């Protein structure tokens, strides 16, 4: 096992512990809490994959961070902070929409890279809107927290979420997963639209009818998805 992989996990565990204390002291906002919950699932998956205990890893991570802080000068810290771009948090969904439980009459699940796609194949001939909460850096989607598909009545009929055991994903991973979800929903004659925020930050453009400007490769993937009734 690579030592850098282990030390990275240990530091992430300790930093998560610190962020949890911020939440416990009611010093956090909704986006902060969303990321904390997402990262908790990711750490559990990574711990299982690496065969490491999270509590023990947190203790070692604390020692690593304390050593770094002891050696770090205030001036170097200021320069690092000044050169690091800040990410923004985009919220299509409310806290209620983000945390609501939902059920599928005809459930279907597919793993697309580091993302899990779920949809209800019983939904037919509906107008559906895709909404997502995600972070943005340099005006491009950075990290997807959660994407959900809503009918006009507000029912949740589909979802894309990061897999806890696969830390990290790219903007192309997200766009490919959206293409698969759209293909599966459109198979049953549903009309699917994408939020303006997703269009802007994932594809860098806006389509009046709400459809994402998919690449030919993504369109072919959607077609294969439809034929196989994903």
From Swiss-Prot:
GO function terms (MF aspect): protein serine/threonine kinase inhibitor activity; RNA binding
Superkingdom in the source lineage: Viruses
Post-translational events: Upon interferon induction, ISGylated via host HERC5; this results in the impairment of NS1 interaction with RNA targets due to its inability to form homodimers and to interact with host EIF2AK2/PKR.
Ranges where the record places region RNA-binding and homodimerization: 1-73
Region Disordered, residue ranges: 205-230
Gene Ontology terms describing biological process: symbiont-mediated suppression of host cytoplasmic pattern recognition receptor signaling pathway via inhibition of RIG-I activity; symbiont-mediated suppression of host gene expression; symbiont-mediated suppression of host mRNA processing; symbiont-mediated suppression of host PKR/eIFalpha signaling; symbiont-mediated suppression of host type I interferon-mediated signaling pathway
InterPro entries given in the database record: NS1, NS1A, NS1A_effect_dom-like_sf, uS15_NS1_RNA-bd_sf
Segments of this protein annotated with the region PABPN1-binding: 223-230
Localization per record: Host nucleus; Host cytoplasm
Any Gene Ontology CC annotation: host cell cytoplasm
Entries under Gene3D superfamilies matching the protein: Influenza virus non-structural protein, effector domain, S15/NS1, RNA-binding
Feature: compositional bias, Basic residues: 217-230
Primary localization: host cell
UniProt record similarity statement: Belongs to the influenza A viruses NS1 family.
HAMAP family: INFV_NS1
Function statement: Inhibits post-transcriptional processing of cellular pre-mRNA, by binding and inhibiting two cellular proteins that are required for the 3'-end processing of cellular pre-mRNAs: the 30 kDa cleavage and polyadenylation specificity factor/CPSF4 and the poly(A)-binding protein 2/PABPN1. In turn, unprocessed 3' end pre-mRNAs accumulate in the host nucleus and are no longer exported to the cytoplasm. Cellular protein synthesis is thereby shut off very early after virus infection.
Subunit record text: Homodimer. Interacts with host TRIM25 (via coiled coil); this interaction specifically inhibits TRIM25 multimerization and TRIM25-mediated RIGI CARD ubiquitination. Interacts with human EIF2AK2/PKR, CPSF4, IVNS1ABP and PABPN1.
Record's protein name: Non-structural protein 1
Organism this protein belongs to: Influenza A virus (strain A/Beijing/352/1989 H3N2)
Organism lineage string: Viruses, Riboviria, Orthornavirae, Negarnaviricota, Polyploviricotina
Gene assigned in the entry: NS
């Amino acid at each position: 096992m690579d030592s850098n992989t282990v030390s990275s996990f240990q530091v992430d565990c300790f930093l998560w512990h610190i962020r949890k204390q911020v939440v416990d002291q009611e010093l956090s906002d909704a986006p902060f809490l969303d990321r904390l919950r997402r990262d908790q699932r990711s750490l559990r998956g990574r711990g299982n994959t690496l065969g490491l205990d999270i509590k023990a890893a947190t203790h070692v991570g604390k020692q690593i961070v304390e050593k770094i802080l002891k050696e770090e000068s205030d001036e170097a810290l200021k320069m690092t902070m000044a050169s690091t771009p800040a990410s923004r948090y985009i919220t299509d969904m409310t806290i209620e929409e983000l945390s609501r439980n939902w059920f599928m009459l005809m459930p279907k699940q597919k793993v697309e890279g580091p993302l899990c796609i779920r949809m209800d194949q019983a939904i037919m001939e509906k107008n559906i809107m895709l909404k997502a909460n995600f972070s943005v850096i340099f005006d491009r989607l950075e990290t997807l927290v959660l994407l959900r598909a809503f009918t006009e009545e507000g029912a949740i009929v589909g979802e894309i979420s990061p897999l806890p055991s696969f830390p990290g994903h790219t903007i192309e991973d997200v766009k490919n997963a959206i293409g698969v979800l759209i293909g599966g929903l459109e198979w049953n004659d549903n009309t699917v639209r994408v939020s303006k925020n997703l269009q802007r930050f994932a594809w860098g453009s806006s389509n009046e009818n709400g459809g994402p400007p998919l690449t030919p490769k993504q369109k072919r993937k959607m077609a294969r998805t439809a034929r196989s009734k994903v």
